[in-house]
């Protein structure tokens, strides 16, 4: 019954007194660590605090690279969501990888820029208490966008001591973070404020201006408690989008140059969330609710003068919405046919009230017309249940079922096609899950998991009739797209210092039909299949040294017959990812070195053009001068490599190519956004 006891063990959040010469640390115990006797799969886990807090982070979203196999890059300004890669998916800005922060979903359905848009720039990494992750559609409580995986992040509720930290870096980087907490009896208030500015290495300065604040109230004990969290975030920036490789090769444009200095954006996010839990020998109950007010505006230009040789191809995307949601879960021990078990049940609701989601052609940030302007109401309701059973002393299994209902109402406000592309509808599906774990020896455990999951599509694609740019009939997409996956895994864990996992997985999607926010129309895709192998190593060698290593290989192909002129490669699907890190800590010193490799990938369905591999090496270190002052150093791209954060292959046309009549129907080329050159950041933290 070890698994049952672990499932019902209450979380404990407590501060530990920092040793002299060390940074204040928050010790956090999750409700269930992924270990032998408690884990449900080989690919689930919890990132060690020493791992994600010590690693150098160029951007807040880099923290998700603590999830093995995940790569987070950027192809535009630092106020925009990262580009994510995992398990053979180019996840764009979040499709098929679900993220939650403080119990609130981050992914945005029917978003102005792209489905599943997951912007983590409001995150304050220093406050993160834990990163828990899962891979695959194997769990009943995992819903939309979680086909490839999911990650859940939370903030601490208490700090050892208040602190202020100032960071200064190259290219105009400056950042101020102040945070503290106060506890009276069983009630704690925590607050943090972050201010950041950055110009970046770009020829057109980024002029990033970011303001961020967190206020959390918590009270109670380890067995019963309440927390309320308020967050406020806003930023604005000028972005350097991807540029044609041909201009870089000819010397016409710097790697860090821009073809449109008016690209950029702004975003604002206000949220209020609350959670309550009650844990005891008879069961656990958790309730949570949230409300989010969100504003987003983005100006982009990817093809320059291809579609509109006179005024250019810049476009504006907008999103203005309020999000409401709530969820309830209950877990209790039970007996099934004389066998010990745990029954978990839950209910979820999310409602997006989108006042405006729009796409507009623009020039110098001035609108020239309207492609789409819609008001959307979207609700998703889910019920789920999962039964865990101890089949014997060394074998446990679970079966689960998730029922999801999606309802939507699209009201088009574009004067020509808006009414025709309006509509309402709903779709539902059932997603079965199952898993088996066998402890074959005290240090070895095998896992078998299978299940169905889904991701939602932009619901504008479910009501569309006519392409708003051409007036031609457009193909509708299903609101929910089903995927089926399975996984076989092994975990070796002789003690708490060493953990090694291997997972072999496969995932099939019935269709990759998507609504393309950049075009305002739908793009039909084909059924696909992915499979791969992942391995992770976590080894605390002794009190000073810690080593981590991750390897991931995947193969992604479209299924079925290929249309004329196309192949079966899923374009932009990363095939090989490797990461390694070493952390050394002794006395007042701490140092870490982290390496990330992202292998080449097909940039078209024929695999005729491939991206170049990218290797990135980062360094971070701190020195605690005394109990109050800690100095820090971060060096990004330590080796000074000239790789690309992102590569695409498509046709574009520049102004000079239009004037010289060289454009024709566009020039197919790589379009790249370089990773940042070597840069140094210095920080000083004063603990009060």
Where are these regions (language model features)?
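Face-selective signature of the C-terminal outer-membrane beta-barrel domain
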Residues: 225-233, 265-415, 437-439, 494, ...
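Short acidic/polar hinge/loop motifs at secondary-structure boundaries
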Residues: 105-135, 154, 477
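Transmembrane beta-barrel wall of Gram-negative outer-membrane proteins
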Residues: 168-197, 202-240, 262-284, 332-333, ...
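N-terminal periplasmic "start-of-domain" segments of outer-membrane beta-barrel proteins
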Residues: 24-61, 78-83
